[in-house]
């Protein structure tokens, strides 16, 4: 952090607004919004972060901010700034993603065409459709039923389509404007699923043709009826009211968000839009940013209704979308939202599963790593990382990979007990001594390789404890990061040397996953500990509020900020007596006192590998 940033951090207001991060070239690399600019912007330059946020922070050389009157105003400003500047670290929707529409042109002799551009030109647009193949299938069927003009410039004499009954030969046919309006209305009814009248007409024509011994013509009508039936089957009915609506669902895990949007048109689910991206703020805030960007895309027409999950601010979405916004509580609409959320979860799980798939590649990676380090194949790898903020709440974490895959049941967390102040070497000495002292005492199976998230100093400390103090023979390697906090090089040997390791190799990708995982696990534990300590300390001394009620409050509200903003009645609903709820509000809302930054962080008491070493 440079002196300019340090000075600016002191001047930040507590108002809502937008902040703009810039790199060394003055280029805007990230735009964000905040309810409290001081707390949010300072958080980037304090404490540990996950890999993606560290990469962002490493490029920040300057920042600006814009104060707004409200959170919603900040949200709208953020969306406009992102659209204007296209910062590389912000959420970006898929490029050039536009869906096809079927259009009846506004011409004297209308045509039925497929287009990806919706214009205010008097034409009638139907869609969007999931892809051009689906749109073409429907158009081919419409061409066989409705004789619209096919030629861009009508020829002076009748064309091929006239002879096969798919064109009225407008140069010789004297149909008036009312005729074409009527035909356009029939197309509209058909595309809305109101096709019973058309099927009845085709059945009548088929019967007349059969009676007249025109069997080929009767067979054509039969085929058309069957084609309509097939199309009906393909377009699954999701709602009985035949409304046009967009259904949003999202899911977050490991610093990533997946948003799924179901396009329901005329009660039929015609397509879904899937986007996965890393998020940097609270998930619900980044979700709102996504929605705002989504409807700025010209290809995304605003439907009659937009359905959103329960935890999203309805008023904020109303400010973004000129449509009816619903948070359904029950029924088929609630089922649609649940389905979108479920699909978002599945998509995100698939993303992470793909990283852990391919047994052959993973097995090959650990075998190659063993050959590279000249050690037996490291079937079991244990990796360590420390986390603290200026020496407060220092912790360490260990993750275990067996056969190249995370073994989460073997993960361990450590509260550093003997170190005072920010001493990373001493913390590493303590945790290595505790872990492998226990391995030695209890005759546990040692790992085939220890990987330290750190450089030469941390690795040498681990070697001293393992080899000199405990007399164990376990290979130890170090993973150093570059100035962008990315996995950079592998250290190994005696003395330590940089291992010649290709960045495109499977063994490099394996080490990268191990380093990212131990870093994530350590930071998650540290944040939980800080948040829990802050939470407990701010609510200490309130009569009637014991550990169980504190835990219930945190599980329900997720953060001190939300407890502070809650009404007494909302706190009572969690099972807290009214007199205690009133005491909580008095404690958290003293006149003029600001809430500490740590209260913004969310806490999850159900993290994996929740085991502590002695």
Curated annotation (Swiss-Prot):
Q: Name one Pfam family in it.
A: UvrC_RNaseH_dom
What Gene Ontology terms describe where this protein resides (cellular component)? cytoplasm; excinuclease repair complex
State the superkingdom.
Bacteria
The segments labelled Disordered in the record are: 595-614
Q: Which InterPro entries match?
A: GIY-YIG_endonuc, GIY-YIG_endonuc_sf, GIY-YIG_UvrC_Cho, RuvA_2-like, UVR_dom, UVR_dom_sf, UvrABC_protein_C, UvrC
**Residues annotated as transmembrane:** none
Tagged with keyword Lipid metabolism:
no
Record field: compositional bias (Basic and acidic residues): 599-614
User: Is DNA repair given among the entry's keywords?
Assistant: yes
Q: Which GO terms describe its biological process?
A: nucleotide-excision repair; SOS response
Query: Where is this protein found?
Result: Cytoplasm
Instruction: Name one molecular function that GO assigns to this entry.
Output: DNA binding
Q: Which UniProt keywords apply?
A: Cytoplasm, DNA damage, DNA excision, DNA repair, Excision nuclease, SOS response
Q: Which HAMAP family match?
A: UvrC
Q: What does this protein do?
A: The UvrABC repair system catalyzes the recognition and processing of DNA lesions. UvrC both incises the 5' and 3' sides of the lesion. The N-terminal half is responsible for the 3' incision and the C-terminal half is responsible for the 5' incision.
Q: Which family does it belong to?
A: Belongs to the UvrC family.
NCBIfam families per record = uvrC
Specify the protein name. UvrABC system protein C
- Organism of origin is Streptococcus pneumoniae serotype 4 (strain ATCC BAA-334 / TIGR4)
**What high-level taxonomic lineage is stated for the organism?**
Bacteria, Bacillati, Bacillota, Bacilli, Lactobacillales
């Amino acid at each position: 952090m440079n002196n300019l940033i340090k000075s600016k951090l002191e001047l930040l207001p507590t108002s809502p607004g937008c902040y703009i991060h810039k790199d060394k070239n003055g280029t805007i690399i990230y735009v964000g919004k905040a309810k409290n600019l001081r707390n949010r912007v300072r958080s980037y330059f304090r404490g540990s972060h996950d890999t993606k946020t560290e990469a962002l922070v490493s490029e920040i050389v300057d920042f600006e901010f814009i104060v707004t009157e409200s959170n919603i105003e900040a949200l709208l400003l953020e969306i406009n700034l992102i659209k204007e500047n296209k910062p590389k670290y912000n959420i970006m929707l898929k490029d050039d993603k536009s869906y096809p529409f079927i259009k009846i042109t506004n011409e004297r002799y209308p045509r039925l065409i497929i287009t990806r551009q919706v214009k205010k030109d008097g034409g009638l647009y139907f869609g969007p459709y999931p892809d051009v193949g689906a749109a073409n299938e429907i158009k081919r069927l419409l061409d066989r039923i409705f004789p619209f003009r096919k030629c861009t410039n009508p020829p002076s004499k009748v064309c091929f389509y006239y002879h096969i009954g798919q064109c009225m030969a407008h140069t010789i046919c004297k149909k008036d404007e009312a005729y074409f309006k009527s035909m356009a209305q029939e197309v509209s009814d058909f595309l809305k699923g109101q096709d019973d009248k058309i099927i009845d007409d085709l059945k009548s024509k088929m019967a007349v043709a059969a009676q007249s011994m025109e069997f080929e013509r009767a067979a054509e009508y039969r085929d058309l009826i069957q084609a309509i039936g097939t199309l009906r089957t393909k377009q699954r009915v999701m709602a009985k009211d035949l409304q046009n609506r967009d259904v949003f669902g999202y899911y977050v895990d490991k610093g990533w968000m997946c948003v799924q949007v179901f396009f329901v048109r005329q009660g039929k689910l015609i397509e879904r839009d899937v986007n996965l991206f890393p998020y940097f703020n609270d998930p619900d805030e980044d979700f709102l940013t996504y929605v705002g960007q989504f409807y700025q895309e010209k290809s995304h027409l605003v439907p009659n209704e937009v359905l959103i999950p329960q935890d999203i601010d309805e008023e904020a979405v109303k400010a973004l979308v000129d449509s009816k916004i619903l948070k359904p509580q029950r029924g088929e609409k609630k089922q649609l939202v649940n389905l979108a959320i479920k699909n978002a979860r599945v998509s995100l799980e698939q993303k992470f599963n793909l990283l852990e798939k391919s047994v052959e590649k993973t097995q090959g990676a650990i075998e190659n790593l063993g050959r590279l380090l000249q050690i037996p194949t490291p079937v079991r790898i244990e990796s360590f990382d420390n986390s603290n903020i200026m020496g407060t709440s220092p912790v360490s974490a260990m993750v275990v990979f067996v056969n190249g895959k995370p073994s989460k049941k073997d993960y361990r967390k450590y509260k550093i007990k003997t170190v005072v102040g920010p001493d990373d070497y001493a913390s590493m000495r303590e945790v290595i001594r505790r872990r492998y002292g226990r391995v030695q005492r209890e005759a546990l199976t040692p790992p085939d390789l220890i990987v330290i998230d750190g450089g030469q100093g941390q690795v040498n400390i681990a070697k001293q404890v393992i080899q000199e103090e405990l007399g164990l023979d376990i290979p130890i390697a170090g993973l150093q990061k570059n100035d962008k906090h990315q996995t950079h090089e592998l250290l190994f040997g005696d003395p330590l040397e940089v291992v010649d390791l290709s960045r495109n190799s499977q063994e490099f990708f394996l080490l990268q996953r191990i380093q990212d995982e131990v870093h994530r696990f350590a930071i998650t534990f540290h944040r939980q500990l800080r948040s829990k300590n802050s939470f407990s300390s701010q609510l200490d001394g309130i009569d009637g509020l014991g550990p169980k009620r504190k835990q219930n409050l945190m599980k329900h509200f997720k953060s001190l900020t939300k407890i502070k903003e809650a009404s007494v009645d909302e706190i009572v609903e969690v099972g807290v007596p009214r007199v205690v709820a009133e005491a909580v509000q008095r404690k958290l809302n003293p006149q003029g006192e600001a809430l500490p930054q740590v209260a913004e962080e969310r806490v999850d008491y159900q993290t994996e590998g929740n085991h502590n070493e002695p």
